[in-house]
Amino acid sequence: IIFNWDWYAGDIMHMLNVREGGLAIHGGLLLGIGVGLILCYVWKVRPFNILDLCAPAIALAQSIGRWGNYFNSEAHGGPTDLPWGVWINGQTYHPTFLYESIWCFILFLILLYVDNHRKFEGQTILIYGILYSCERFCVEALRTDSLMLGPLKQAQVISLVIILVCVILYVILNKKRGANKI
């Protein structure tokens, strides 16, 4: 929506038409976290505790959800001769959905461990943000259907911003943990 504002500005309700696609994980995560933060404020609960609780489930849901890209024959990489390439319309392509699905499942396992051994509130969600965004930056380089933002793909730019924000928050919250032990 942000990158096609001129198209959406004339018909705001068109933004809600999910049947036409255009859904992206970064937008979904930002909306979900935004709504979650509002609910935390309303319910007077500590947001990083809730985000930490949700992080492993988000990674698992992404691992499963990426298979939708396979069934829709979308969000794949460029042509490949690798034996695990997926066959779409007479050509084999990098199965970027599979790369991301496998990584998100591994991330799910990592986050379960981190959450059970976390040192401060926010550690689990911040590690999710860093590791998922690193993976997404790399896999995005293989995809052929991405929006560009200068020399990088839009999702790569967003991933870099998320990594930067999460690393800064990680350092800040980790320094505060001495005063605020869990």
Predicted regions located by residue number:
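A feature for loop-to-transmembrane-helix boundaries and adjacent hydrophobic helices
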Residues: 1-182
